[in-house]
């Protein structure tokens, strides 16, 4: 239902946000 869709969207957003934060704060080989 709609609640599940919202839950999935929130989960994806949280995962993306966590990934961005981790990428920003972890040393990147350049």
Curated annotation (Swiss-Prot):
Its main location: secreted. Expressed by the skin glands. The keyword Phosphoprotein does not apply. Keywords: Amphibian defense peptide, Antibiotic, Antimicrobial, Secreted. GO terms for cellular component: extracellular region. It comes from the Eukaryota. It is found in: Secreted. GO terms for biological process: defense response to bacterium. Probably has antibacterial activity. This is Nattererin-2. The lineage of its organism: Eukaryota, Metazoa, Chordata, Craniata, Vertebrata.
């Amino acid at each position: 239902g709609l609640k599940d869709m919202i839950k999935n969207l929130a989960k994806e957003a949280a995962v993306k946000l966590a990934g961005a934060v981790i990428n920003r704060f972890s040393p990147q080989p350049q």
